[in-house]
Regions:
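Conserved N-proximal alpha/beta basic substrate-recognition cap immediately N-terminal to
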Residues: 1-73
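Short glycine-enriched loop/turn motifs at secondary-structure junctions
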Residues: 69-70, 99-103, 179-180
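Short, hinge-like loop/turn segments at secondary-structure boundaries
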Residues: 19-21, 62-65, 90-93, 112-113, ...
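ATP-dependent carboxylate/phosphate-activation module, predominantly the ATP-grasp catalytic core
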Residues: 112-122, 133-181
Length: 181
């Protein structure tokens, strides 16, 4: 295999398949690569449909709900949502921007005063958030699908001593948990 960078879109037709190993989002260069690979008839992970579906947490929540897939209770939050309504989820509560990935734009409020502060910060950047009760876990799953079929599942473990798979230091650095699979 060959590693290609974000400026190598023109060379994509020279390859047999594309396995994206960077952040995926509709407004990211990875999406253009994915669309181009699909239009060339190449196998691609992550395919454009998966990026659209999985990069928006609110869309994904509604899709799972519609298909009866079990998940944590959740609430879609806007500036008009009374904070008291969010308290019904209990504390700690996790707030997620719709388009964050790899632990970015996911924050945890331990108590009501934290919730008020985080809501103000996050709603200044996004009109909607997804709120869920915090449920401790040792890992998240990443599922790979190719042409509608399960290809792989791997565990993304939480960063050591942290509640997310990635811990950011606020200076552009981060550390991650180990990956299995």
């Amino acid at each position: 295999f060959e590693v290609i960078g974000p400026r190598a879109l023109h060379s994509l037709p020279e390859h047999d398949a594309l396995f994206i190993r960077t952040v995926t989002a509709v407004d990211h260069v990875s999406f253009r690569f994915s669309q181009t690979a699909e239009s060339l008839g190449m196998p691609v992970i992550d395919d454009p449909q998966s990026i659209v579906r999985c990069s928006n947490k609110i869309y994904l929540h509604e899709l799972c709900e519609r298909h009866g897939i079990p998940m944590l209770p959740a609430m879609i939050v806007s500036r008009k949502t009374p904070a008291a309504e969010l308290h019904t989820l209990g504390f700690p509560v996790v707030l997620k921007a719709p388009d964050g990935s790899f632990s970015a734009a996911v924050r945890r409020a331990e108590k009501p005063v934290d919730l008020d502060r985080l809501l103000a910060e996050m709603l200044a950047k996004s009109p909607l958030l997804l709120a869920q009760p915090f449920s401790p876990t040792d890992f998240d799953w990443r599922i790979g699908v190719l042409e509608g079929r399960l290809l792989y599942a791997c565990k993304y473990h939480m960063a050591r001593g942290h509640w997310q798979i990635a811990q950011y230091d606020g200076k552009g650095g981060s550390r991650s948990g180990r990956v299995e699979g």
